[in-house]
Amino acid sequence: MGMPSWLENIVFYEIYPQTFLDTDGDGIGNIQGIIRKLDYIKNLGCDGIWLNPCFASPFYDAGYDVADYKKVAPRYGTNEDLKELFRKAHEKGMKVLLDLVPGHTSTDHEWFRESCKAEKNEYTDRYVWTNNVWDDFKDVGSITGSIRGFSDRNGCCAVNFFSVQPALNFGFARCDKEWQQPMDAPGPMATREAMKDVMRFWMSMGCDGFRVDMAGSLV
């Protein structure tokens, strides 16, 4: 699939939701505030909005630590508010891109809680784990850190940035370590399908596409 033609010349206005217009007086910007300012953004000459992370999160990293990919953070509003933003932006001939963080989640994500369990389950291989808590990732250049000693599982989990952001398992092109899985292993394949499901979910509501955060962490 090629690049959509509308991407060739579009001008985007980037919005970090909590710093934009606050419509309910809690001191935090929200999606309704963005809706109110669509004409303002359009009049600036922008025909697209790039919305920084707006999903449910504990916000240890400005929302780039996602706890639920299919739920808008309550501080910003609801899923229906975001759906309304898509619709009203389209009425004005504007596009909306969401920030997608596919390389890692929050440690608060249900996937990670399940992956931490000693018992084998469908999320055991959703993240990058070693086979022993004493094994780390010092010889793997693509991994910058790890967390360990906090779960029932005997293993060390890779992180992509901060210690609250465990790395999702998309597999490895070359497997040099016992714990590494190839890209076509069941775990990595399930991770990719889960992320495709997230994208389908929001596009069915009217999202026009995604800006992928830390895309390099996927390869």
Where are these predicted regions, by residue range?
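Acidic/aromatic-lined carbohydrate-recognition and catalytic surfaces
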Residues: 2-196, 204, 211, 215-219
